[in-house]
Amino acid sequence: MMSLDRRRKSKLSSSFIDDIKTHIEELEKRARSRRKDDQISFDLCVEAVIADLTRSLFNETTPWLYRSMRSNSFTGNAIGFKTFRLVIGLMEAAELIVINAGGNARNTFKEPGDGAPAFHPGLATRMRASDTFKSLAIEKGFSADNYNKHFLQIKPSRLVSLRVSSSRHGAIKVNARPMQFEPTEKTEEIRLEVKEINDFLFKQKLSGGVFTGFQRIFNEGDRRDFDWNMGGRLYCLGDNNYQMMKKDARLNMKINGRRVAEVDINASWLTILHALLDAPLPLRGDLYHVKGYDRSVIKGWITATLGFEQFHTRWPPRMRKSITEAGVKMTKRMSMQRVGDAVMSKYPFLSSWPEIDIRWSRLMYEEAMCITDAMRDLRLQGIASYPVHDSLIVPVRNIGKAKATLENAYLSRLGVKCRLSVNRRGKSKAP
């Protein structure tokens, strides 16, 4: 993502940014100088774009950065939509950036009267550094090893975000767009808590992973019953943060020089749903264990179902891929219907899932509240913890305290004891 949250940090990065800024301003050929405030905004945007493009050169996954070009996606940010559009336009003219515009894609297979959508929802605009930009950056001396010496990650200023409900065009899910909201006492309370979390973690040293600061994102803000009680996860900003890493890679991180462990909540949403419906949990064992099926298949079915309003008639492609990557060969007996029958024999209340008035956003909210409650308890003990949605990463020596705070959070809020597993480098302990 082109997050626009990095700034110059050294003489080297300053000269690189200033040289490019001078060059694109010469291309612009303005008749008159910008007003002071407009020039400050322009300079800031150039700096942020160059910082992101330089970082993308050393991204092993993809050189492409994405950025929504909706004007409302810039609301509340230090850099405005018009300024951003101007800067990337000038950089494209200078052949420093390659832009792949987003937007809807025409459905070439649509036939008259077939009911299919005329367009598929498109991707956000993609951008990458051009070969010219790459040559200039490498010639200047930037590398993956020294990037953080020359560019500074700033703390996020927008700590609470709200999105409308997502929608679908046939089988294609359309990502939820940002939604504006008026600040209230409740949103200020949420904002201050996120700020407290960020301030504490920015004082810690996370090695082997990148912490960029959290934003708490709430969902389905356009629902009538929304009251800051849907979604609400802590998301680390940017596309190279520790939350985006594979679990094995995260276990190689260190917190303040100490080895880490990841404490996972076993079947978190399923546990929460049991509590909200006052349904008794099985006395022991892995909640994803159903006789005759690999764990990944049962987890996949439950995850797919609780994230949808109805029962799926076939496996979502992403879930099928996840199962096959776990080494499981999909067979005819693993249809959504047959696996569902097996799951519902263990959890009968799931047979009425489409009629239950609890949706994924409520389950996510309850989980997020338990996670933030546990983080607060650990923080008061001086212990740094880094969430990955349904798990907490802590120093190995604090595993016991992390487990105790998570168990207490679920018990206090939901009246249910969650089951935990601990993953360490070279070791794992199941619930």
What are these regions (language model features)?
Residues 15-77:
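Short amphipathic alpha-helical interface segments
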Residues 62-81, 241-358:
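Helical catalytic core of nucleic-acid polymerases
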Residues 85-89, 375:
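Short, hydrophobic-biased segments on the C-terminal half of alpha helices
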Residues 116-297, 389-391:
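Acidic, glycine-rich two-metal-ion catalytic cores of nucleic acid-processing enzymes
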Residues 264, 302, 384-395:
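Catalytic palm active-site di-aspartate
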Residues 369-388:
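Active-site palm subdomain of RNA-directed nucleic acid polymerases
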Residues 399-431:
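Polymerase palm active-site segment centered on the conserved acidic dipeptide of motif C
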